[in-house]
């Protein structure tokens, strides 16, 4: 049976390491955790933890691709701190453009795509900090823009 205190220590250490923004591979994270006393850690466990905590790869200040946590996130919901990662929402005649904090665009796009056509979203394309979203049939770009603003409680 797992020791809950040990598991909690592992999670704290894992999050602290990712906040350093210097690990470019899962293997490097495994080695760092082993150095901190977590002997039974392996690459598959690190991979599951990266997924569970919504870690993304982004460029650090040295322009290196590293793993980081965009925010304290579990499963993305519109009431979670995820909305704090949305910096701006604008639109033109074709698409709604959403600007996010670096590394957060794919997570936000995943949430939008999960809402789907019923909410007016045909699909999204995400880069590192920008998302293009297009409206589903029967919705205007302006309606989609307003729906996204409401979703993330932004000002109109």
Swiss-Prot record:
InterPro entries: Arg_repress (IPR001669), Arg_repress_C (IPR020899), Arg_repress_C_sf (IPR036251), Arg_repress_DNA-bd (IPR020900), WH-like_DNA-bd_sf (IPR036388), WH_DNA-bd_sf (IPR036390). Keywords: Amino-acid biosynthesis, Arginine biosynthesis, Cytoplasm, DNA-binding, Repressor, Transcription, Transcription regulation. GO terms for biological process: L-arginine biosynthetic process; protein complex oligomerization; regulation of arginine biosynthetic process; regulation of arginine metabolic process. It is found in: Cytoplasm. GO terms for cellular component: cytoplasm; transcription regulator complex. It comes from the Bacteria. Pathway: Amino-acid biosynthesis; L-arginine biosynthesis [regulation]. GO terms for molecular function: arginine binding; cis-regulatory region sequence-specific DNA binding; DNA-binding transcription factor activity. HAMAP family: Arg_repressor (MF_00173). Belongs to the ArgR family. Regulates arginine biosynthesis genes. This is Arginine repressor. It comes from Yersinia pestis. The gene is argR.
